[in-house]
Amino acid sequence: MLTADKEYIATGHFQIGSIMVRVLSFDNETIDQKFYEHRLAVALDVRRCIGVANRTNNNTYRLVHGEGDNLPGLVIDIYDKTAVMQAHSVGMHMDRNIVAEALKSVMHDSIENIFYKSETTLPFKAELGQENGFLLGGSKEDVAIENGLKYHVDWLRGQKTGFFVDQRDNRSLLERYSNGRTVLNMFCYTGGFSFYAMRGGAKLVHSVDSSQKAIDLTNANVKLNFPDDPRHEAFAEDAFKFLDNIGQQPGSPTYDLIILDPPAFAKHKDALRNALKGYTRLNQKAFEKITPGGIIFTFSCSQVVTKDNFRNAVFTAAAMAGRKVRILHQLHQPADHPINIYHPEGEYLKGLVLYVE
C-alpha cells in the first residue's frame, strides 16, 4: 500500500470484498518464510508465557489467533502432535505452504502433522478448488487432552478446527459449580461442558444438540472419560422445543444448572436485530425453566453482537420471565485468543454466569 505520493504505508494480502486488505506489516519487509517464522515464534512465546504450551495435562491450545497475533486471516490450533491450520483469506491460502514450513521450523519435533482445513472459511472456494488435507504427516490419531480430560477431534468434518478451544477456561469454571447439580448442556456439540460437569460431581447431565453427529461425538467423548457412567444422557432435539418440554411430563427432570452456548446467531450486521431477538427468546426460556437457586452459563460468539447488546438481551429475557437474577461472572475468550488493541473486533466471545432466584 502506497500514498498518492508513492510513499510506503503497509504490506498486506489483497482480495475483493468488504475487507480488501489485511495488513501484515507496517514495515517495508518481504513476506516470506522468515517473516512467518518470526511471527510464529512470538506467538509461541506468548503461549509459553501464559502457560498453555508444554503442560502435561493439556496439549490443546490456539497458537495463532489472526489479528490478535498480527497474522490476519490465519488460525492455528494445536492438538497434541497435530497443528490444524485454517486460512480466512485468499492471500493466506496462497501462502499456506511457506506458513507450514515456518511452523515446522518453529515447533521442531513438537508437531508431526499439519492439517489444512479451509474449505468452509475461504471466499471464492470454487475458483480456488480448495480441499482439506494434510500438509505434513497424516496421522489419524484424534484424541487430545484439555485440563486432564480427553476428547476426540474431527479434523475433517468438525466445526472450526475440530473443537472449541476458546471455552477452555469457562469449562473449568463450570466444573466448580457442578457438584450435586442437575445439568443441562444446550447446543452441546462435542460435549465439552458435559464431561467437565461430570468431573465436577454433577448428579445428572443431559446434553442436547439438533445434530445427531454432535450427539454421537458427545457420547464418544463422555465414554472416553467416564465409561459406563449412568449420569449422562444425550438428546438429538431442537433446543427451543427441548426447553419448552421441561417439566411437562410427570417425573421428568428439572435443572439447576443450564449452559446456553449456541452457534453464532449473527455473522454480519444485517442479522443483528434478529440475532438479539433469538438470544432474548432462548434466555427467557431458560429463565422460565431453571429451578430457584439455579445457575445459568450463557454465551454469544457473534462478533457483531457487542457486550452491551448481549447483556441487554439477557436482562430483557430475565424481566420477561419475571426472575430475579445476579451476575456472578462476566466471561470472555481465553488468553491464547489475544485481542490486538488496534482490532477490538477480535473480542468476539462474551458470556455471563447468572444466579437465578
What are these regions (language model features)?
Residues 1-80:
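Non-catalytic accessory regions of SAM-dependent methyltransferases
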Residues 64-77, 93-164, 172:
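Non-catalytic substrate-recognition/targeting regions of SAM-dependent transferases
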Residues 180-189:
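Conserved class I S-adenosyl-L-methionine
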Residues 190-203:
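Conserved SAM-binding loop of SAM-dependent methyltransferases across substrates and taxa
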Residues 204-209:
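Conserved SAM-binding motif I beta-strand of class I
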Residues 211-259:
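S-adenosyl-L-methionine
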Residues 254, 295-357:
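C-terminal catalytic and target-recognition region of SAM-dependent MTase-like enzymes
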Residues 255-285:
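Mobile active-site "lid"/loop adjacent to the S-adenosyl-L-methionine
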